[in-house]
Amino acid sequence: MKIDSSLPLEYSTEENRLKIFGFWIFLGAEIVLFATLFTVYFTLHTRTGSGPNGAEIFELTPVLWETFLLLTSSFTIGLGVHAMRIGNKKAMMAFFIITLLLGLGFLGIEIDEFVTYVHEGATIQTSAFLSALMTLLGTHGLHVTFGFFWGVAILMQVASRGLNPQTANKAFIFSLYWHFLDVVWIFIFSFVYLKGLIS
C-alpha cells in the first residue's frame, strides 16, 4: 500500500481516497432520503385533524438546547479532525469523546420531547402532521444514535491501533457523517420548529 505523506493521513492512500469518494456518494443517497421526508412533512404539516399543530406542541427552549448541542458537536468534531491531522492522538480522542457526549445530550432532550408529546396525546397516529413530524425527527434521531455507536467503535480502534491511514480514514468519514447530521438539523430547526412556532 503506497502512502503519500504529502497528503493528510486520511487521504494518504488510493484506497482511502476511494472510500471518502464512496462515502460522499452515500451522503447523496442520505440527502435524497431526508429531502423525501421533508417533502412529506411540508405536504402534510397543515393536516392536523383533531390533533394539535406545531405552535401548540413545539417548545422553543429544548429545541434551542438541541441546536446548541449539535452545532457545538460539529465544532468539536472539527477540532478532533484537526488534532488527528497534526498527529495528536490524545486531543483527537478527547474532542471525539466531547462530540459524542454532546450527541448523547441531544438524544436525551429529543427522547424527552417525544415522551412529552405522547403524554399530551400527540402520537404518530393522531394526525398526518404528527406522523410526518415524528417520522422526520425519529429518522434523524436514529441517525444520531447510530453515529454515537459508530463514534465509540472508532475511538476503540484508535485507542488500540493508534493513528494510521486506516483509522484516520474511518475517523474522517465519521466526521463527514456527523457534519451532515448537523446540517439536516439546521433545516429541521429552521423549517419545522421555527416555521411551526410562528405560523
Predicted regions and their residues:
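...captures the hydrophobic TM-helix bundle architecture rather than a specific catalytic motif
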Residues: 1-199
